[in-house]
Amino acid sequence: MLEKIREELNSYFLERREEIDIALTSILANEHTVFLGNPGVAKSQLIRAIASHINANYFEKLITRFTTEDELFGPLSIKELKDNDRFVRKTSGYLPTAEIAFLDEVFKANSSILNALLSIINERIYHNGDRIEKVPLISLFGASNELPEENELLAFYDRFLFRKVVRGIRSYENLSKLIDLEEEYKPKTIIDVEDVKKMQNEALKVDISNIKDDLIKIKLSLESEGIRISDRRFKKSVKAVKCFAYLNGKEKADENDLDILRHIYWNEPDEFYKVSVEIFKISNHFAGFALEQREILDSLMNEIKKINKDRIKLGGIEYRKCLEILGKLNSMSITLKDVKNKAIEANKPYELVEDVLKEVEGFKKYVEGLLKG
């Protein structure tokens, strides 16, 4: 069932393979995910689409500095207050009764609602007046254009096990597909919450004995690079690896399933590259090479931005610079195709190599267009 959902989502959401895998793993692991990124990269649309595949109590709210507790946790019961002098909220249909939840602009939450949010996502409880209500939450998804800066929000941010910076579509091929894409996503495969719980239990049975040493090596290696991983986050990450392996149809996890750790172990977006490099050293050096090529591609894109486009047609230094960049892109394309074939031969995941290859090919077309004028 999950494989069908995965396929449906990937067929519609272009260049969102990692985000989809993170979200589905998050649901299997009973954990929470935050997607970061500029407006317009379909963070909200993707989260809604994922939720549409599960027949669950769903709650969604756009958070502002002025969002009140009533809007998230439900209005006060006037009857309880009048008849019994009790301060109780009517929580039905609000966050305390949700199984899947989405808070957009999640880090705009004010201090008055943070403590309640922490109890809900941490302990799955809500303090409703003088009683404690159990919260059936499977996963809470957050979206934000920026990381939190206030200290009081950092503890809340830390409770999102999975983090991902969502980028705009980069490949020429996928931009072309985007033009013809239907406006509305329509799920075909829908599962019940009981199905989710059954899969969660099955995922916990995945054998990780082959990669225990690798898990420890990665943690120690990253900490030697100055990236601290708390014991709690490390323990939860082991469960995430099991769930990712299960998502990949395995009963026994292998080094390829360590890839999910790339979206767990960083705190600042600048750490993502360093974390990925260390993990790929153990799990998949083909993907590690592709990541290095993406860094080079980003630098070439920045070089193009600095060029005066109007002067390229004059055939001077700007034209020669574009030719030089095009030569590098041609070389990268040839190398990435070779690396992709080697990854396939070695039975290693090659999706990241393919993604970067498409990005290179797309940018190559753009540079060729500049040279043609």
UniProtKB/Swiss-Prot annotation:
<dbReference type="InterPro" id="IPR050513">
    <property type="entry name" value="RavA_ATPases"/>
</dbReference>
<dbReference type="InterPro" id="IPR027417">
    <property type="entry name" value="P-loop_NTPase"/>
</dbReference>
<dbReference type="InterPro" id="IPR001270">
    <property type="entry name" value="ClpA/B"/>
</dbReference>
<dbReference type="InterPro" id="IPR045427">
    <property type="entry name" value="MoxR"/>
</dbReference>
<dbReference type="InterPro" id="IPR003593">
    <property type="entry name" value="AAA+_ATPase"/>
</dbReference>
<dbReference type="Pfam" id="PF20030">
    <property type="entry name" value="bpMoxR"/>
</dbReference>
<dbReference type="GO" id="GO:0005524">
    <property type="term" value="F:ATP binding"/>
</dbReference>
<protein>
    <recommendedName>
        <fullName>Uncharacterized protein MJ0812</fullName>
    </recommendedName>
</protein>
<dbReference type="GO" id="GO:0016887">
    <property type="term" value="F:ATP hydrolysis activity"/>
</dbReference>
<dbReference type="InterPro" id="IPR041538">
    <property type="entry name" value="RavA-like_AAA_lid"/>
</dbReference>
<dbReference type="Pfam" id="PF17868">
    <property type="entry name" value="AAA_lid_8"/>
</dbReference>
